[in-house]
Amino acid sequence: MKNPITKFAAAAVIITAITLGLFEFIDTGSQSGVVWAEVAQNVEASQGVIWRLRETGSRDPNDDWPNSYMITWRSPAITRTDRYRGGQIWRTIYYNLDTKTVIGVLHDVQRYHKEAMSDERVQSVRADKDRWTTSQSLINHLLARKHHSLDQKMIDGVLCEGIETTDASGLPVKSFTARGWVSVETGYPVLGEIEIIDDGGIRHTTTLDQFQWNVDLSASDVEPEIPTDYEPL
């Protein structure tokens, strides 16, 4: 059975993939102020990004929506995800592909785990990230889905334009809706929304916001500090 760190790490990789992938829609026929091809280029070129993710519909009875959320820092070599519950940090997972290191911290039980990553694991993590952040492969995937433009609207004081798909073909769900909202001024994503009804009829929602793009993320700033009273897992 996977330990809590391994399960959280796997979930964090999937969420990271979905997060950046959502915004690489392209609407080549759009007449709006946003050039979606440039949005995809902006996302791919950003050397560092930070965002918040909130979810509903989890089957985990310990989740405490709306007080549960995740903050992720990501650069080409580094990914860190902090999960919060009840306003307190609960779990941290950190990957450094340059040093081939993974660190997991279980703040709720004051335990941690640190290990070296094999070359195979580094390649696996990098492949999971590249599958969604390389514009060519992801764009080809998303262009296969029907999508349409949304009217402009203000989001947190920022004028945004959006795009939406409800094409659930090939997905193991009853229904699927994904929306990406981009700043008209900067061409960077501001908000992402995903709504799914699974085969069991349970509605799941994911909200991605509080984006910071082109952030200089160094390992010294992002690597989690392990309190001295935490014990090895």
List where the protein language model places each region:
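Single-pass transmembrane signal-anchor helices and their membrane-water interface zones
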Residues: 1-38
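Non-transmembrane domains of secretory- and envelope-associated proteins
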Residues: 7-22, 141-161, 169-178, 184-233
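Edge/loop elements at the starts and ends of beta-strands within beta-rich repeat scaffolds
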Residues: 43-48, 74, 98, 156-158, ...
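A short, Trp-centered hydrophobic/proline-enriched beta-strand micro-motif
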Residues: 43-62, 78-81
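Generic short beta-strand segments
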Residues: 49-59, 164-169, 194-195
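An acidic-aromatic
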Residues: 66-132, 195-207
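A residue-level detector for well-ordered beta-strand positions
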Residues: 93, 180-181
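Non-cytosolic head/periplasmic domains of membrane-anchored proteins
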Residues: 101-175
